[in-house]
Protein backbone atom coordinates (compact mmCIF):
# COMPACT_ATOMS: atom_id res chain seq x y z
CA UNK A 1 0.00 0.00 0.00
CA UNK A 2 1.39 3.43 -0.96
CA UNK A 3 1.81 6.28 1.51
CA UNK A 4 0.37 8.75 -1.01
CA UNK A 5 -2.96 6.89 -0.85
CA UNK A 6 -3.40 8.50 2.58
CA UNK A 7 -3.01 12.05 1.31
CA UNK A 8 -5.95 14.45 1.24
CA UNK A 9 -6.57 18.11 0.46
CA UNK A 10 -6.94 20.35 3.47
CA UNK A 11 -7.44 24.12 3.26
CA UNK A 12 -4.86 25.95 5.38
CA UNK A 13 -7.58 27.88 7.22
CA UNK A 14 -8.96 24.63 8.71
CA UNK A 15 -5.72 23.95 10.62
CA UNK A 16 -6.48 25.19 14.13
CA UNK A 17 -3.86 27.72 15.25
CA UNK A 18 -5.26 28.16 18.77
CA UNK A 19 -7.49 26.20 21.13
CA UNK A 20 -11.22 26.86 21.30
CA UNK A 21 -12.20 29.81 23.49
CA UNK A 22 -13.16 27.43 26.28
CA UNK A 23 -11.80 23.91 26.85
CA UNK A 24 -14.34 21.43 25.54
CA UNK A 25 -16.01 23.99 23.27
CA UNK A 26 -15.33 21.89 20.19
CA UNK A 27 -17.37 20.07 17.58
CA UNK A 28 -17.64 16.29 17.44
CA UNK A 29 -18.07 14.17 14.33
CA UNK A 30 -19.44 10.68 15.00
CA UNK A 31 -18.62 7.89 12.56
CA UNK A 32 -20.44 4.56 12.71
CA UNK A 33 -17.83 2.29 11.18
CA UNK A 34 -20.34 -0.44 10.32
CA UNK A 35 -22.74 1.71 8.30
CA UNK A 36 -20.44 4.62 7.46
CA UNK A 37 -23.10 7.01 8.82
CA UNK A 38 -21.88 10.42 10.00
CA UNK A 39 -23.44 12.67 12.62
CA UNK A 40 -22.47 16.23 13.58
CA UNK A 41 -22.58 16.84 17.32
CA UNK A 42 -20.84 18.89 20.03
CA UNK A 43 -18.12 17.56 22.32
CA UNK A 44 -20.17 18.52 25.39
CA UNK A 45 -22.78 15.95 24.27
CA UNK A 46 -20.26 13.11 24.48
CA UNK A 47 -21.44 11.66 27.85
CA UNK A 48 -24.97 11.08 26.49
CA UNK A 49 -23.61 9.47 23.29
CA UNK A 50 -21.27 6.93 24.92
CA UNK A 51 -22.59 3.41 25.67
CA UNK A 52 -23.49 3.04 29.37
CA UNK A 53 -21.40 -0.02 30.19
CA UNK A 54 -18.21 1.14 28.48
CA UNK A 55 -14.66 1.35 29.79
CA UNK A 56 -12.76 4.46 28.66
CA UNK A 57 -8.97 4.45 28.74
CA UNK A 58 -6.97 7.70 28.69
CA UNK A 59 -3.26 8.52 28.35
CA UNK A 60 -2.13 10.61 31.34
CA UNK A 61 1.35 11.49 30.07
CA UNK A 62 2.35 15.11 30.66
CA UNK A 63 3.98 17.29 28.00
CA UNK A 64 7.48 18.52 28.75
CA UNK A 65 8.39 22.14 28.02
CA UNK A 66 10.72 20.53 25.54
CA UNK A 67 11.47 23.35 23.07
CA UNK A 68 14.58 25.25 24.15
CA UNK A 69 16.51 28.20 22.75
CA UNK A 70 20.22 28.93 23.15
CA UNK A 71 22.87 31.23 21.71
CA UNK A 72 25.88 30.00 19.78
CA UNK A 73 29.37 31.56 19.98
CA UNK A 74 28.39 33.82 17.07
CA UNK A 75 25.35 35.00 19.09
CA UNK A 76 22.91 33.26 16.75
CA UNK A 77 19.72 31.99 18.40
CA UNK A 78 19.40 28.21 17.94
CA UNK A 79 16.35 26.03 18.59
CA UNK A 80 16.29 22.46 19.89
CA UNK A 81 13.62 19.94 20.84
CA UNK A 82 14.62 17.89 23.87
CA UNK A 83 13.67 14.32 22.93
CA UNK A 84 14.85 12.30 25.93
CA UNK A 85 17.86 11.76 28.22
CA UNK A 86 20.34 9.31 26.71
CA UNK A 87 20.26 5.89 28.31
CA UNK A 88 22.56 5.41 31.32
CA UNK A 89 23.27 9.16 31.52
CA UNK A 90 22.84 11.18 34.72
CA UNK A 91 20.43 13.58 33.01
CA UNK A 92 23.13 15.81 31.51
CA UNK A 93 23.26 14.00 28.16
CA UNK A 94 20.21 14.36 25.89
CA UNK A 95 19.07 13.36 22.44
CA UNK A 96 17.81 16.53 20.77
CA UNK A 97 16.23 17.43 17.45
CA UNK A 98 18.07 20.41 16.01
CA UNK A 99 16.45 23.05 13.83
CA UNK A 100 18.78 23.76 10.89
CA UNK A 101 20.54 20.54 11.87
CA UNK A 102 23.28 20.74 9.22
CA UNK A 103 24.81 23.70 11.06
CA UNK A 104 24.89 21.92 14.42
CA UNK A 105 28.06 19.85 14.27
CA UNK A 106 29.98 18.09 17.08
CA UNK A 107 32.12 20.55 19.00
CA UNK A 108 29.67 23.42 18.69
CA UNK A 109 28.80 25.03 22.03
CA UNK A 110 25.73 26.88 23.25
CA UNK A 111 24.77 29.19 26.13
CA UNK A 112 21.32 29.24 27.73
CA UNK A 113 19.64 32.18 29.45
CA UNK A 114 20.46 30.96 32.98
CA UNK A 115 24.14 30.44 32.14
CA UNK A 116 23.84 26.70 31.46
CA UNK A 117 26.27 25.55 28.77
CA UNK A 118 25.98 22.66 26.34
CA UNK A 119 28.00 21.10 23.55
CA UNK A 120 27.07 18.91 20.58
CA UNK A 121 29.10 15.70 20.89
CA UNK A 122 29.54 12.56 18.81
CA UNK A 123 26.82 10.04 19.62
CA UNK A 124 27.75 6.50 20.60
CA UNK A 125 24.60 5.25 18.88
CA UNK A 126 23.53 6.02 15.29
CA UNK A 127 21.14 8.99 15.07
CA UNK A 128 19.06 10.16 12.12
CA UNK A 129 20.15 13.29 10.25
CA UNK A 130 18.19 15.90 12.23
CA UNK A 131 19.10 14.49 15.65
CA UNK A 132 22.09 15.35 17.82
CA UNK A 133 23.59 14.31 21.13
CA UNK A 134 23.90 17.31 23.48
CA UNK A 135 26.05 17.33 26.64
CA UNK A 136 25.05 19.88 29.29
CA UNK A 137 27.20 21.11 32.17
CA UNK A 138 24.41 20.28 34.61
CA UNK A 139 21.54 17.84 35.04
CA UNK A 140 18.55 18.83 32.90
CA UNK A 141 15.29 17.82 34.55
CA UNK A 142 11.64 18.78 34.18
CA UNK A 143 11.99 21.50 36.82
CA UNK A 144 14.65 23.21 34.63
CA UNK A 145 12.59 22.68 31.46
CA UNK A 146 9.49 24.13 33.16
CA UNK A 147 11.47 27.27 33.91
CA UNK A 148 13.44 27.75 30.69
CA UNK A 149 11.71 25.58 28.09
CA UNK A 150 8.70 26.27 25.89
CA UNK A 151 5.65 24.20 25.00
CA UNK A 152 6.59 22.14 21.90
CA UNK A 153 3.75 23.26 19.65
CA UNK A 154 3.72 21.37 16.34
CA UNK A 155 5.19 23.06 13.23
CA UNK A 156 1.78 23.55 11.60
CA UNK A 157 0.90 26.01 14.38
CA UNK A 158 2.53 29.14 13.00
CA UNK A 159 3.07 31.17 16.15
CA UNK A 160 5.12 31.24 19.31
CA UNK A 161 3.78 29.50 22.39
CA UNK A 162 2.01 31.60 25.01
CA UNK A 163 1.09 31.18 28.66
CA UNK A 164 -2.30 29.87 27.51
CA UNK A 165 -0.57 26.94 25.78
CA UNK A 166 1.04 25.89 29.08
CA UNK A 167 -2.51 25.10 30.20
CA UNK A 168 -4.37 24.19 27.00
CA UNK A 169 -1.66 22.00 25.39
CA UNK A 170 -1.89 19.79 28.48
CA UNK A 171 -4.75 17.48 29.45
CA UNK A 172 -6.56 18.19 32.73
CA UNK A 173 -5.59 14.71 33.96
CA UNK A 174 -1.91 14.80 32.90
CA UNK A 175 0.29 13.36 35.65
CA UNK A 176 3.66 12.07 34.50
CA UNK A 177 6.16 14.15 32.51
CA UNK A 178 7.70 12.58 29.44
CA UNK A 179 5.87 13.57 26.23
CA UNK A 180 7.25 15.89 23.57
CA UNK A 181 3.80 16.35 22.03
CA UNK A 182 0.37 16.28 23.62
CA UNK A 183 -1.86 13.20 23.42
CA UNK A 184 -4.25 15.60 21.71
CA UNK A 185 -7.53 13.66 21.88
CA UNK A 186 -7.50 14.30 25.62
CA UNK A 187 -7.22 18.08 25.28
CA UNK A 188 -11.01 18.39 24.85
CA UNK A 189 -11.91 16.85 28.21
CA UNK A 190 -12.90 18.99 31.19
CA UNK A 191 -13.38 17.79 34.75
CA UNK A 192 -17.11 18.45 34.29
CA UNK A 193 -17.34 16.13 31.25
CA UNK A 194 -15.28 13.46 33.03
CA UNK A 195 -17.68 13.66 36.01
CA UNK A 196 -20.70 13.24 33.72
CA UNK A 197 -19.07 10.21 32.10
CA UNK A 198 -18.48 8.63 35.52
CA UNK A 199 -22.03 9.52 36.63
CA UNK A 200 -23.35 7.54 33.67
CA UNK A 201 -21.62 4.44 35.07
CA UNK A 202 -18.76 4.42 32.59
CA UNK A 203 -15.45 3.30 34.08
CA UNK A 204 -12.33 5.41 33.48
CA UNK A 205 -8.78 4.09 33.59
CA UNK A 206 -5.37 5.50 32.63
CA UNK A 207 -2.24 4.34 30.88
CA UNK A 208 0.94 6.34 30.34
CA UNK A 209 2.57 6.44 26.92
CA UNK A 210 5.14 9.20 26.51
CA UNK A 211 4.48 10.68 23.09
CA UNK A 212 7.73 10.67 21.15
CA UNK A 213 9.10 10.40 17.66
CA UNK A 214 7.04 7.31 16.84
CA UNK A 215 3.82 9.30 17.06
CA UNK A 216 4.65 12.49 15.20
CA UNK A 217 7.45 11.78 12.71
CA UNK A 218 6.16 11.58 9.13
CA UNK A 219 5.97 8.36 7.13
CA UNK A 220 8.80 8.88 4.65
CA UNK A 221 8.72 5.46 2.98
CA UNK A 222 6.97 5.19 -0.40
CA UNK A 223 5.28 1.97 0.71
CA UNK A 224 3.77 2.07 4.17
CA UNK A 225 4.95 -1.48 4.87
CA UNK A 226 8.55 -0.16 4.74
CA UNK A 227 7.98 2.44 7.46
CA UNK A 228 9.67 1.77 10.82
CA UNK A 229 8.22 3.35 13.94
CA UNK A 230 10.49 4.81 16.62
CA UNK A 231 10.18 3.10 19.99
CA UNK A 232 8.03 4.80 22.63
CA UNK A 233 7.83 3.86 26.31
CA UNK A 234 4.66 3.22 28.26
CA UNK A 235 3.38 2.09 31.64
CA UNK A 236 0.21 0.20 32.58
CA UNK A 237 -0.77 -0.25 36.23
CA UNK A 238 -2.02 -3.57 37.56
CA UNK A 239 -5.35 -1.87 38.37
CA UNK A 240 -5.82 -0.71 34.77
CA UNK A 241 -4.81 -4.12 33.42
CA UNK A 242 -7.40 -5.85 35.61
CA UNK A 243 -10.13 -3.38 34.56
CA UNK A 244 -9.38 -3.92 30.86
CA UNK A 245 -9.31 -7.72 31.26
CA UNK A 246 -12.65 -7.62 33.11
CA UNK A 247 -14.29 -5.43 30.43
CA UNK A 248 -12.97 -7.68 27.68
CA UNK A 249 -14.22 -10.83 29.44
CA UNK A 250 -17.67 -9.27 29.93
CA UNK A 251 -17.86 -8.15 26.30
CA UNK A 252 -18.16 -4.48 27.26
CA UNK A 253 -17.05 -1.72 24.86
CA UNK A 254 -13.47 -0.54 25.43
CA UNK A 255 -13.09 3.02 24.16
CA UNK A 256 -9.56 4.32 23.67
CA UNK A 257 -9.07 8.06 24.02
CA UNK A 258 -6.38 8.84 21.49
CA UNK A 259 -4.21 6.83 19.13
CA UNK A 260 -1.47 6.56 21.77
CA UNK A 261 -3.88 4.67 24.02
CA UNK A 262 -4.76 2.35 21.12
CA UNK A 263 -1.09 1.58 20.49
CA UNK A 264 -0.45 1.02 24.21
CA UNK A 265 -3.32 -1.41 24.72
CA UNK A 266 -2.84 -3.29 21.45
CA UNK A 267 0.89 -3.69 22.23
CA UNK A 268 0.32 -5.02 25.74
CA UNK A 269 -2.58 -7.39 25.06
CA UNK A 270 -1.73 -11.09 25.16
CA UNK A 271 -4.38 -12.71 22.95
CA UNK A 272 -3.50 -16.27 24.04
CA UNK A 273 -3.84 -15.61 27.76
CA UNK A 274 -6.49 -12.89 27.40
CA UNK A 275 -4.33 -10.74 29.65
CA UNK A 276 -3.04 -7.19 29.53
CA UNK A 277 0.63 -7.09 30.49
CA UNK A 278 1.26 -4.43 33.10
CA UNK A 279 4.37 -2.53 34.21
CA UNK A 280 6.96 -0.57 32.22
CA UNK A 281 7.10 -1.57 28.54
CA UNK A 282 7.95 -0.17 25.11
CA UNK A 283 6.42 -0.38 21.66
CA UNK A 284 7.19 0.31 18.03
CA UNK A 285 3.84 -1.03 16.81
CA UNK A 286 2.70 0.42 13.48
CA UNK A 287 -1.03 0.00 12.89
CA UNK A 288 -2.25 0.37 9.32
CA UNK A 289 -5.00 -1.23 7.17
CA UNK A 290 -4.89 -5.05 7.34
CA UNK A 291 -4.04 -4.92 11.08
CA UNK A 292 -6.40 -7.11 13.14
CA UNK A 293 -7.39 -5.35 16.36
CA UNK A 294 -7.25 -7.50 19.48
CA UNK A 295 -8.81 -5.21 22.04
CA UNK A 296 -10.01 -1.85 20.73
CA UNK A 297 -13.05 -1.32 18.54
CA UNK A 298 -14.03 2.23 19.51
CA UNK A 299 -11.91 5.37 19.47
CA UNK A 300 -12.18 9.03 20.44
CA UNK A 301 -9.60 10.98 18.45
CA UNK A 302 -8.74 14.18 16.57
CA UNK A 303 -8.44 14.76 12.83
CA UNK A 304 -4.94 13.77 11.71
CA UNK A 305 -2.37 15.01 9.22
CA UNK A 306 -2.24 13.65 5.65
CA UNK A 307 0.01 10.62 5.07
CA UNK A 308 0.67 10.24 8.83
CA UNK A 309 0.86 6.97 10.76
CA UNK A 310 -2.15 8.25 12.73
CA UNK A 311 -4.47 8.59 9.73
CA UNK A 312 -3.34 5.07 8.79
CA UNK A 313 -4.26 3.82 12.27
CA UNK A 314 -7.80 5.24 12.16
CA UNK A 315 -8.18 3.83 8.63
CA UNK A 316 -7.24 0.40 10.00
CA UNK A 317 -9.94 0.70 12.65
CA UNK A 318 -12.81 2.21 10.67
CA UNK A 319 -11.90 1.42 7.06
CA UNK A 320 -10.05 3.77 4.73
CA UNK A 321 -13.17 4.62 2.71
CA UNK A 322 -15.11 5.54 5.86
CA UNK A 323 -12.31 7.72 7.19
CA UNK A 324 -11.78 9.60 3.95
CA UNK A 325 -15.53 10.10 3.56
CA UNK A 326 -15.59 11.49 7.13
CA UNK A 327 -12.61 13.75 6.45
CA UNK A 328 -14.22 15.10 3.25
CA UNK A 329 -17.37 15.82 5.26
CA UNK A 330 -15.28 17.53 7.96
CA UNK A 331 -13.63 19.76 5.34
CA UNK A 332 -17.00 20.65 3.77
CA UNK A 333 -18.47 21.46 7.18
CA UNK A 334 -15.36 23.44 8.14
CA UNK A 335 -14.31 21.36 11.14
CA UNK A 336 -10.94 22.39 12.59
CA UNK A 337 -8.09 19.91 12.17
CA UNK A 338 -5.06 18.64 14.12
CA UNK A 339 -3.89 19.29 17.70
CA UNK A 340 -6.15 22.20 18.65
CA UNK A 341 -8.94 21.12 16.30
CA UNK A 342 -12.27 19.36 16.67
CA UNK A 343 -12.85 15.73 17.63
CA UNK A 344 -14.10 12.50 16.11
CA UNK A 345 -15.73 9.48 17.74
CA UNK A 346 -15.49 6.16 15.91
CA UNK A 347 -18.16 3.71 17.09
Swiss-Prot record:
One of its GO terms (cellular component) is cytoplasm. Belongs to the QueA family. This is S-adenosylmethionine:tRNA ribosyltransferase-isomerase. One of its GO terms (biological process) is queuosine biosynthetic process. It comes from Treponema denticola (strain ATCC 35405 / DSM 14222 / CIP 103919 / JCM 8153 / KCTC 15104). Keywords: Cytoplasm, Queuosine biosynthesis, S-adenosyl-L-methionine, Transferase. It is found in: Cytoplasm. Its EC number is 2.4.99.17. The keyword Cytoplasm applies. It catalyses: 7-aminomethyl-7-carbaguanosine(34) in tRNA + S-adenosyl-L-methionine = epoxyqueuosine(34) in tRNA + adenine + L-methionine + 2 H(+).
Amino acid sequence: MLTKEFNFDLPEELIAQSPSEKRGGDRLLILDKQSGKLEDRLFTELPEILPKNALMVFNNSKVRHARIYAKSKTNAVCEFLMINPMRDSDGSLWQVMAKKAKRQKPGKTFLFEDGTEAEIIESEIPLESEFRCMKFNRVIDDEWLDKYGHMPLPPYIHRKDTQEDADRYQTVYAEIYGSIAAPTAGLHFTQEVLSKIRDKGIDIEYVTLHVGLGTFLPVRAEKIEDHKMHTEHFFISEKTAQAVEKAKKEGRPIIAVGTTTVRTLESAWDEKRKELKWGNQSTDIFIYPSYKFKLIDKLFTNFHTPESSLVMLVSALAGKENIFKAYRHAVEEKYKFFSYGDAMLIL
